[in-house]
């Protein structure tokens, strides 16, 4: 049951009674639990967002209601916990972050499942992934050792690998193993970059500036050229262009990332040399399916090789030809022996840096592409060779 004090706060906040406050009022508002971050607490019924002072709902520092509840629980702010639940926050998100018995008991009184910490953790993780609740997830997991320790070590990494392999998470990490805290932060940060969730990215870049270079690397690898453009031109975050291109090429089918590095000035021939050297290309040859041998190369780095040549990389340099022979790859040799089939694509020759124009150009390239798909092309060439 909510006290008169909580109901009074609800009315005062919803009517924006503190929108015009004097500096002398700050201490009183803080003592009454009516202060949030850097100003009087505010709430938007339509957006279900908790704000501070003159902040708008779209501000990077505004809080989704469930996330605000988690913060209030961590800080043991009893009246705010009751208030946020009254507005519709899910109290189960709160109980898993309760640090004291008193706060945990309050969450149970407000309807939380006492067993949620034992039986609901995995379902919650999946829910947060499906709903793309990045900031809520970080509010729950980051610096919450009790939750991280409740995961079995093997299961924890299975959950991380369920969405991503961990290659990109360790890009700039010198130590072989990260703490769970750092790993879970990077996991959700990477998730935001992958799905182009602008508000979480901006919030996290503001809160964790030491990860700026890693953010740029991740955006390149995932082909989020909006974020590459923002980091490179608006924040002046820099990385050697050929290193950027290497990261772009490391992900099969990353046309956007590869093109953007090319447009910035990366060396295409150098990129092609690195691609041909990737061990994964040697996975191209055979796979047994129902007793028949089928070529299995669509998922390899050949698509990136194909695209680099479309951009203008020269596959017929002496160094590249020697690398191909060293690889002893029949398909690669056949592909590179057909000079009329592999050549620059006219649509890709202009260097464009505006992300919206790049998306249009790559879409046009895909629609006008006249080459065979790699699997069909390889089969055709092998048949011709025989």
Curated annotation (Swiss-Prot):
It comes from the Viruses. InterPro entries: ASFV_MGF360 (IPR002595). GO terms for biological process: taxis. Pfam families: ASFV_360 (PF01671). Plays a role in virus cell tropism, and may be required for efficient virus replication in macrophages. Belongs to the asfivirus MGF 360 family. This is Protein MGF 360-4L. It comes from African swine fever virus (isolate Tick/Malawi/Lil 20-1/1983) (ASFV).
């Amino acid at each position: 049951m909510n006290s008169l004090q909580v109901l009074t706060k609800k009315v005062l906040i919803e009517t924006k009674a503190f929108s015009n406050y004097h500096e002398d009022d700050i201490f009183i508002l803080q003592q009454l639990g009516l202060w949030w971050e850097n100003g009087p607490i505010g709430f938007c019924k339509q957006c279900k967002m908790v704000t501070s002072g003159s902040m708008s709902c779209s501000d990077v520092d505004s809080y989704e209601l469930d996330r605000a509840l988690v913060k209030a629980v961590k800080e043991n702010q009893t009246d705010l916990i009751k208030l946020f639940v009254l507005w519709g926050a899910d109290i189960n998100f709160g109980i898993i972050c309760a640090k004291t018995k008193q706060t945990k008991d309050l969450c149970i009184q407000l309807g939380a499942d006492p067993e949620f910490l034992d039986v609901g953790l995995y379902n919650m993780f999946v829910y947060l992934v499906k709903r793309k609740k990045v900031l809520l997830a970080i509010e729950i997991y980051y610096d919450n050792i009790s939750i991280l320790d409740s995961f079995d070590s093997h299961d924890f990494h299975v959950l991380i690998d369920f969405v991503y392999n961990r290659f990109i998470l360790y890009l700039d990490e010198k130590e072989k193993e990260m703490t769970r805290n750092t790993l879970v932060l990077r996991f959700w940060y990477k998730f935001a970059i992958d799905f182009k969730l602008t508000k979480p990215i901006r919030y996290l870049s503001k809160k964790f500036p030491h990860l700026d270079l890693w953010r740029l690397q991740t955006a390149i690898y995932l082909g989020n050229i909006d974020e590459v453009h923002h980091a490179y031109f608006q924040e002046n975050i820099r990385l050697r262009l050929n290193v950027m291109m290497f990261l772009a090429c490391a992900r099969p089918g990353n046309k956007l990332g590869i093109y953007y590095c090319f447009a910035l000035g990366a060396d295409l021939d150098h990129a092609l040399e690195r691609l041909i050297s990737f061990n994964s290309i040697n996975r191209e040859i055979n796979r047994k399916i129902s007793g028949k041998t089928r070529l299995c190369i669509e998922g390899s780095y050949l698509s990136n090789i194909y695209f680099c040549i479309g951009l203008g990389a020269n596959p017929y340099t002496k160094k590249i030809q020697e690398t191909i022979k060293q690889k002893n790859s029949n398909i690669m040799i056949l592909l590179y022996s057909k000079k009329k089939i592999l050549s620059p694509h006219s649509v890709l020759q202009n260097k464009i840096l505006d992300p919206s124009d790049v998306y249009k150009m790559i879409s046009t390239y895909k629609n006008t592409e006249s080459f065979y798909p790699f699997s069909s092309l390889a089969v055709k060439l092998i048949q011709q060779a025989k």
